[in-house]
Structures are given as C-alpha cells and as structure tokens.
C-alpha cells in the first residue's frame, strides 16, 4: 500500500511543506514541496487565517496518511511566540482532518538523515536530495526542512 507523508516546517512568515509517498517496495517519491507565505504587513489574525485556509487546501490535495512536524523548542522570545501561534493553527487543522502526527526535533532529523545530530543545513539538504533522487538541492530552505521531516517520518514508521 502506498503511504503519503506530509512534512511541515512551522513558521508564521513562511511555512514549509513537502509531500512524499512511500511505495510498497519502500521506494520514495516526491509529490511536491514549497511554502505557504504570509505578508509581514498584515495583522496576525489574517496571517494565521491564511495558514489555516492554505493548509486545509494542501491536506485536501495531498490527502496524507501521516504528517511530520518539527517539535517546538524555544528560539528568541518574539519569534517563539509567533511560531507557537502558527503551530497552534497547524495542530488545529490536523486535528480537524483526524491525521496521525509525528514530531521530531531538529537533532532527530539530522541524526536520521546524516548519521549525526549536529549536521549543518547543507548536509541535511544533500541527504534529502540523495534520498529523494532530486536533480538539485530543494529550495527554499523551509521546503527542504519540510521534506527532511517527511523523510525522517518515512524511516521511523
């Protein structure tokens, strides 16, 4: 049975997504990846609504069996609050769709994909490119991170 996994890299300004399938023979295929962007000048409520609506659309389009998301941890205080608000909207939408969720810390993703938990961003992106047989490094970074989360989930099942 084909399994669809959607990786999400939470953010208020840019939310990365990456959708992959795991085939019955365990081979991996990229369906799509990209970002949901919100305008910095908009009020926070409007930005969260954009995430809410666009994420519903993504879920209807990809129909994932599982969603992988970065586990929340603290950044700078102002950024932490904004990411937490966006993450709350993401969790709400996932609950509305009754989707299974796996959470990973950045160190878990790095360890799974590169073999060491202190890998830099380029090492992770090269691992994503290699595992998914992409012609070039996935861009932008938020989408690459989302693909890395989806890949990590595929290896953990």
Swiss-Prot record:
Example of a GO biological process term: DNA recombination
Keywords: Cytoplasm, DNA damage, DNA recombination, DNA repair, DNA-binding, Endonuclease, Hydrolase, Magnesium, Metal-binding, Nuclease
Annotated localization: Cytoplasm
SUPFAM superfamilies, A to Z: Ribonuclease H-like (SSF53098)
Active site feature: 9, 70, 142
Cofactor binding mode and count: Binds 2 Mg(2+) ion per subunit.
Matches recorded under CDD domains: RuvC
Positions bound to Mg(2+) 2: 70
Domain of life: Bacteria
Necessary cofactors: Mg(2+)
Catalytic activity: Endonucleolytic cleavage at a junction such as a reciprocal single-stranded crossover between two homologous DNA duplexes (Holliday junction)
GO molecular function per UniProt: crossover junction DNA endonuclease activity; DNA binding; magnesium ion binding
Family statement: Belongs to the RuvC family.
Function: The RuvA-RuvB-RuvC complex processes Holliday junction (HJ) DNA during genetic recombination and DNA repair. Endonuclease that resolves HJ intermediates. Cleaves cruciform DNA by making single-stranded nicks across the HJ at symmetrical positions within the homologous arms, yielding a 5'-phosphate and a 3'-hydroxyl group; requires a central core of homology in the junction. The consensus cleavage sequence is 5'-(A/T)TT(C/G)-3'. Cleavage occurs on the 3'-side of the TT dinucleotide at the point of strand exchange.
Name of the protein this chain belongs to: Crossover junction endodeoxyribonuclease RuvC
Upper lineage: Bacteria, Bacillati, Cyanobacteriota, Cyanophyceae, Gomontiellales
């Amino acid at each position: 049975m084909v399994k669809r996994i959607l990786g999400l890299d939470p953010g208020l300004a840019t939310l990365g997504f990456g959708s992959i399938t795991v085939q019955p023979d365990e081979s991996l295929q990229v369906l799509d990846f990209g970002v949901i962007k919100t305008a910095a000048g908009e009020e926070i409520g409007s930005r969260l609504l954009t995430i809410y609506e666009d994420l519903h659309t993504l879920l209807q389009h990809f129909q994932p069996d599982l969603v992988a998301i970065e586990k929340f941890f603290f950044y700078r205080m102002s950024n932490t609050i904004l990411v937490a608000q966006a993450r709350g909207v993401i969790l709400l939408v996932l609950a509305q769709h009754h989707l299974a969720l796996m959470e990973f810390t950045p160190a878990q993703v790095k360890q799974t994909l590169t073999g060491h938990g202190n890998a830099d961003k380029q090492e992770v992106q090269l691992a994503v490119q290699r595992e998914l047989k992409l012609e070039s490094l996935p861009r932008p970074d938020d989408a690459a991170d989302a693909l890395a989360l989806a890949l990590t989930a595929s290896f953990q099942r």
